[in-house]
């Protein structure tokens, strides 16, 4: 065998050996990674992912319900407008018919009485007094005819306008009914979708170990509800937040406060928002419930709505609606009681309580908690009500 052939064979064998050991090394690394991966972490991550999807659907469902309520109100208003316009049309037609009868009578009298032109009276009058009488009668008849014709014309115009208004309101009522039907169908679809997602989330929750469930169910420390700093914005911005538009937890407690807990001022500057925060903090430990808005269980926007209700402020049960109501607030100017919304679709909400903390109802299996405000995901915006 020639030298170059032996060299070529040896090179092929060497390449094969290197490829084998390289493949073995990579496979061993992947296997080791799989062996070292914590199944518990995978289960929790999957639960969080599924719960997040269910929360998005829940808040979209709330928004769809608000949209349906608005469309139904528009439909009721359109139906009422249609009824009013039809009543006005009937009245206009009745008035027109009345004047039509009067005009017909005047026309008949004129026809039966002959010509009413002044020159005819002059030419046919047999005496000055008869001329005066005829001219007087002609003036009265002409005035009556002119008045009746003017009223007849006005009634006709009114009837035409009433008919046009009735036609428009009928079209508006049909459009409102169609829009309401479309929104109702969308709402029903989201309701069905949510029920499936809830079943999947609960199934994933069952897969957790008892220890994991216990850890999730721990509400953590309950802040005192004695007082809240009326203005305690975070001292720094979280990573990735634009300057002046995204806070992070403060590092030092306000004067008079416990370390790690917001300070609450009993009365005065906080106003209604103090009552909002106090109400929300009384629910720390309450369970998460899809669509919940009462102490038996809350979803994120349900907790916000309920807490504000306790202060006499009515808010919608929808994080997306909360993200667009009230007054916008820069994150550097946050005050306790401001509403925070999260993610690009504003599908999560919580209540800022000061010192970089917020109270919220986050997800299934996790009770209402106080957490750092930047721990729930990217902040969408902040609103003050």
Curated annotation (Swiss-Prot):
Transmembrane segments: none annotated. The keyword DNA repair does not apply. One of its GO terms (cellular component) is peptidoglycan-based cell wall. Residues 270-385 form the NlpC/P60 domain. Pfam families: NLPC_P60. The keyword Nucleus does not apply. Residues 235-257 have a biased composition (Pro residues). Disulfide bonds: none annotated. It is an enzyme of class 3 (hydrolase). GO terms for molecular function: cysteine-type peptidase activity; N-acetylmuramoyl-L-alanine amidase activity. The active site is at residues 300, 348, 360. Residues 235-268 are annotated as: Disordered. One of its GO terms (biological process) is cell wall organization or biogenesis. Keywords: Hydrolase, Protease, Thiol protease. Its EC number is 3.4.-.-. It comes from the Bacteria. Belongs to the peptidase C40 family. NCBIfam families: wall_hydro_RipC (NF038345). This is Probable endopeptidase Rv2190c. It comes from Mycobacterium tuberculosis (strain ATCC 25618 / H37Rv).
